[in-house]
Amino acid sequence: MVATNRCCVFALLFALLLVHSLTEAGKGKEVLGKIKDKLIEAKDKIKSGWERLTSQSEYACPAIEKFCEDHCAAKKAVGKCDDFKCNCIKL
């Protein structure tokens, strides 16, 4: 009789632990989902800020001028950045 009651108590505790674990796992997914959404939102803000910055030619050229210089140097020319277009001028 006592052994049966202990079994029931342990089974009840196990069931409560299982329910608690499943509940916490659901909350964990919810928290991870919120973190993922915030990271996506931050990425979109950074990307739109960069696009806005580079859409203005006076700011874009310094950002890509080094790429243009390197690209044209490989062709044995001088690179000149002009409104997002890399112009290679041969010497």
Curated annotation (Swiss-Prot):
GO cellular component: extracellular region
Propeptide: 26-44
Family: Belongs to the long chain scorpion toxin family. Class 2 subfamily.
Organ and tissue specificity: Expressed by the venom gland.
Residue ranges constituting the BetaSPN-type CS-alpha/beta domain according to the UniProt record: 58-91
Subcellular location: Secreted
Domain of life: Eukaryota
InterPro entries in alphabetical order: Long_scorpion_toxin_alpha/beta
Record's signal peptide: 1-25
Chief subcellular location: secreted
Disulfide bonds, paired cysteine numbers: 61-81, 68-86, 72-88
A molecular-function term among this protein's GO annotations: toxin activity
A biological-process GO annotation: defense response to bacterium
Name of the protein: Potassium channel toxin TtrKIK
Primary role: The full peptide presents antibacterial and cytotoxic activities. The synthetic C-terminus (AA 33-76) inhibits voltage-gated potassium channels Kv1.1/KCNA1, Kv1.2/KCNA2, and Kv1.3/KCNA3.
This protein's UniProt keywords: Antibiotic, Antimicrobial, Disulfide bond, Ion channel impairing toxin, Neurotoxin, Potassium channel impairing toxin, Secreted, Signal, Toxin
